[in-house]
Design a protein with these regions (language model features):
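Hydrophobic/aromatic beta-strand patches that form the interior of the parallel beta-sheet core
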Residues: 3-5, 55, 173
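Short secondary-structure boundary/capping segments
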Residues: 4, 43, 163-164
Length: 210
């Protein structure tokens, strides 16, 4: 008997565990949100610092381990860029011939997609004149590989959401927030640690929630 278990990057709560934050503190923060109470200043400041760290590190085990061992942003960035290079090698190795360049183009367009106030994925951002028929298979490949996830718009916000989704109206996010950060300009991570989100605030928090 075999059971298939899907593995995902660490979420923020799991990242807190990895950083030695106990359940008492986490439960206290949860209680504040559930009861609509103000989080104590000291805890709020610590949680915001950890959230910024989570944004730049993400939840991939190799990157989290690097962060815990070194606390060095440059080392973290190098590990993430190596992982991105491995993703791109897999695109060449495992994708069908016609899709190979399209997959990489779709993947590399994600920061630009999220930086704009678009309500859905724009194929013209991937390449001028780009069409759904040209790239939809590439997006599916990236999703099947666990590199990205799609979030669909809905006609109405009622359950079942999937039944009310608009299949040709979606946005694409990286499965791991740290990978998105590593795709941005070098130095962005150091700025985020200082609390300076620059022009990426919308993209960062959209991707976090996705």
């Amino acid at each position: 008997y075999e059971a298939v278990i899907d593995m995902y990057p660490l979420d923020f709560e799991e990242f807190l565990w990895a950083n030695g934050i106990g359940e008492t503190v986490i439960d206290s923060v949860k209680s504040c949100f559930e009861n609509e109470k103000v989080v104590p200043d000291g805890i709020h400041k610590a949680m915001m610092e950890l959230l910024y760290r989570y944004v730049i590190v993400g939840g991939l085990p190799e990157v989290v381990n690097c962060f815990l061992e070194t606390k060095n942003v440059e080392f973290i960035y190098k590990v993430q860029r190596n992982l991105i290079a491995e993703y791109e090698e897999d695109m060449i190795k495992y994708a069908g011939g016609a899709d190979k360049p399209n997959i990489r183009e779709c993947f590399e367009s994600i920061p630009k997609q999220l930086a704009k106030e678009n309500k859905k994925f724009q194929y013209s951002i991937v390449k001028k004149g780009g069409r759904s028929s040209q790239y939809i298979g590439s997006i599916q490949w990236l999703e099947d590989a666990g590199i990205v996830r799609r979030c669909y718009n809905t006609r109405i916000t009622e359950l079942p959401l999937e039944g009310n989704s608009i299949k040709d109206c979606f946005k694409v996010y990286t499965t791991d927030i740290g990978i998105l950060m590593a795709m941005l300009d070098y130095g962005t991570q150091a700025d985020i640690l200082k609390g300076n989100l620059l022009g990426y605030k919308g993209a960062i928090f959209e991707n976090l929630m996705a």
